[in-house]
Amino acid sequence: MTEVASSVVYEVLGRRAQDVDEPIMDYIINVLADEDFDFGEEGEGAFDAVGELLVAAECVSDFEECRLVCSKLSDKFGKHGLVKPTPTVRSLAMPVRMNDGMDDGPVKKKKPEPVDGPLLTERDLAKIERRKKKDDRQRELQYQQHVAEMEAAKAGMPTVSVNHDTGGGSAIRDIHMDNFNVSVGGRDLIVDGSITLSFGRHYGLVGRNGTGKTTFLRYMAMHAIEGIPTNCQILHVEQEVVGDKTTALQCVLNTDIERTKLLEEEIQILAKQRETEEPTAKDGMPTKDTVEGDLMSQRLEEIYKRLDAIDAYTAEARAASILAGLSFTPEMQLKATNTFSGGWRMRIALARALFIEPDLLLLDEPTNHLDLHAVLWLETYLTKWPKTFIVVSHAREFLNTVVTDIIHLQNQKLSTYKGNYDIFERTREEQVKNQQKAFESSERSRSHMQAFIDKFRYNAKRASLVQSRIKALDRLAHVDQVINDPDYKFEFPTPDDKPGPPIISFSDASFGYPGGPLLFRNLNFGIDLDSRIAMVGPNGIGKSTILKLISGDLQPSSGTVFRSAKVRVAVFSQHHVDGLDLSSNPLLYMMRCYPGVPEQKLRSHLGSLGVTGNLALQPMYTLSGGQKSRVAFAKITFKKPHLLLLDEPSNHLDLDAVEALIQGLVLFQGGICMVSHDEHLISGSVDELWVVSDGRIAPFHGTFHDYKKLLQSST
């Protein structure tokens, strides 16, 4: 009997059973082969007895599949006659009196039957634990391999610097790239792509998170696409500058390598001239030093002419102007780069790129690390950019301002549209409508012709008509069916309980970090469940600090901050995205964050924020920035918070995802307080604007557009 049971179990479990330790398989088989074992309805008894073990041993992927497997086991065991028959109910021949045959003596309690040992022995549990650790090590190894590949790719990026040499070949104009493919990790992102970048045009690259926008930019930066001229300077602003003792200003100036070398040579020659200054020989003949001095003077003259030709003397002013536009004060420009945070070093990288003016500039979310003042300056600067650039951005208004064309990446294809993002959206919508109409018309024609052909195919009298229909069907133009992107969703859970107002209250609260000056004085405000607030102000003014005071991560130096004992606060920031375990997958990450919660419940919650299907099982290092943000949102909102504190929540999301985020925030049944400079997000999801400046918080009476116009007029 056990041999038959063994063959059935291995047949149902298939290949996965071969990877399970023998003691565990023996235990499962012996439990199911017991002659008194009751499989129950649809294998429920088997699920109760060995279901947890099957999942733990990875014989099945989850409990849902486990139920199906247990049902199959029940059926298979039944076909082999190994299932205990269900007892039938028979009618009694005559009534029975329940007290017949019973004496009045005390009833002896039946001793409980000995229960089998634990489901698994300690040895078996240890084996399962070792298997889990082995899987963790394997995931970590794959992640480290991915990191090494990325570092190698970055190391392979060509060094780009200011190019003053216009004599080495013709100037770069239009760039034609035809029939190219882009893939990563064996997955095709662009297939048979073709695109022409016209000189001086400003392109916005749009598409869903994970479609391959950043990878496409990297391919171009590495000249990995045929059609890019070898002498074309391409600069991809992707990573922050490495911090060292070089000042921010000098870091930008150092990109002009020729200028730097000429200035260094000038200093060396001047020093040498001072050392060798001596009168001529007594006989009036020039000495060796005099001849060398003449040569040095001649070289100095050449250096000065070249420095003048390459505008070397205006370079410092140009670099300082760019840094100032990106919110660097004169004092900050003279600070060492290793004293700046990652966000500020990213600004220095952007400043270097703008100073270099490459033939093709590639910008990936350039506004992520900028405040509104810097964004407005960058908009103006890029609008006047004389060469070609491609920008990826989630900021709709930014794209509307700076781009002249849109490149749309969808379904592994690239399409180009004239105009800004709003024009693209209208054009694309009309195009999709027309394509759908053409497809439906074509299908109706095909169906009508095919019906005629099928009806009269064997009718000799209509043979000629049938043949003409067949030829017409072959000639009928093929129209592709419209494949729409799946709808995005951000469904934030509704809190079960609602604490009374105010849930957060500041009363004369002041704050300063230990040993430093007060950043805020006498703050007085309250936040309720119906609050919809956006805080705006320059970077470094303390907006994120206020969010930490609200959440309780920081305590006021004086005054009080009241928080309702029942309030649950969720905080989203770039720190939460950066803190994800990239070697894990979203589902496993959530299971570790919330142990004991059923897998299906966690899957459902991930799905409510757009992390569905296979995406929930992909290693997180393969996810795009926007997809990682969704996982971070899932983690912080699982406990059904009453208040969402959001620090730049739209960073890394694509434009459709920002739209879905707006809808999710509008429907959220709780309070919202965000820090953002995204005009579309703020205008669509909040109704209060707070301006942070000079250690105070003041309400702004107007729209975000009004605030933006006020800033523009002041600069």
Swiss-Prot record:
SMART domains for this protein: AAA
Record carries keyword Cell division: no
Positions bearing N-acetylthreonine: T2
Keyword hit for Cell cycle: no
Keywords, alphabetical: Acetylation, ATP-binding, Nucleotide-binding, Repeat, Transport
Chain segments carrying region Disordered: 96-118
Gene3D superfamilies, A to Z: P-loop containing nucleotide triphosphate hydrolases
InterPro entries from the UniProt entry: AAA+_ATPase, ABC_tran_Xtn, ABC_transporter-like_ATP-bd, ABC_transporter-like_CS, ABCF_EF3_subfamily, P-loop_NTPase
Residues annotated as binding ATP 1: G207, R208, N209, G210, T211, G212, K213, T214
Biological processes annotated in GO: defense response to bacterium
Family assignment from sequence similarity: Belongs to the ABC transporter superfamily. ABCF family. EF3 (TC 3.A.1.121) subfamily.
Protein name per Swiss-Prot or TrEMBL: ABC transporter F family member 3
